[in-house]
């Protein structure tokens, strides 16, 4: 279906140059200069949605075309000259660029506030899927007692999916910004602290826990104190979300995820609740 959509869009000589890049919600291809993100017919609307959210984030100039037709949707963008996040490519310039990018996103207001009901509902789902893991259940109960810390926060524009595959670092010698986020379909209103927590658990943790914490806290220095304090809630919550995802979506990976992520979640909660640290 992806090939059919592109055949209707591209001349044969360009079609022959396409190389697959992967992708979960869509199939992604490049001809070296452009990226073609192809959505299935039932998700064709996501091409336009992602283009609008890229524009909201300040990346509208990268969008070249949005095509929606009988075969599905296609988002065409300029190719960013970089590769997915990797520890060996992470530098002080990378960290500064990440800080600037997330601060810029989180200045953009979104309607509504984060509600206590949605946070408790999320924790209940985690309790159900992790019902046979006593330490995880204890953490769920502890976070329920602290839910007031995060409830009532005004929503800001967040990417909400900054795992390593979506965070591109500029190739050495290339021009343009140091970092770029792809996959904006999930972007929307949320708590900036959750966005930073997702960045830690999905990307920064590849640096090792000590370096990941240091990078997170260095970024968070520029945020309001309240955002920094809510990391104590959202980082453990995000690890629980990861465990819930593995248990329900990819159970074969759950034992390893449990071994890697639960100790980090418990340690982060222990180290930053109660909030003794002078942020």
Question: Language-model segments: what does each one mean?
Answer:
Residues 69, 74-88, 125-126, 240-255:
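A glycine-centered beta->alpha junction motif in the catalytic cores
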Residues 193-223, 236-253, 263-264:
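Active-site activation/catalytic loop segments of kinase-like enzymes and analogous catalytic loops
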Residues 10-30:
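ATP-binding glycine-rich phosphate-binding loop
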Residues 41, 179, 186-189:
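Activation segment
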Residues 157, 180-183:
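Pre-DFG segment of protein kinase catalytic domains
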Residues 2-9, 110-160, 164, 169-173, ...:
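An alpha-helical support segment within catalytic cores of ATP-dependent transferases
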Residues 34-76, 85-105:
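A conserved alpha-helical element in kinase catalytic cores
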Residues 66, 81-137, 153-155, 186-190:
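A cross-family kinase active-site recognition segment
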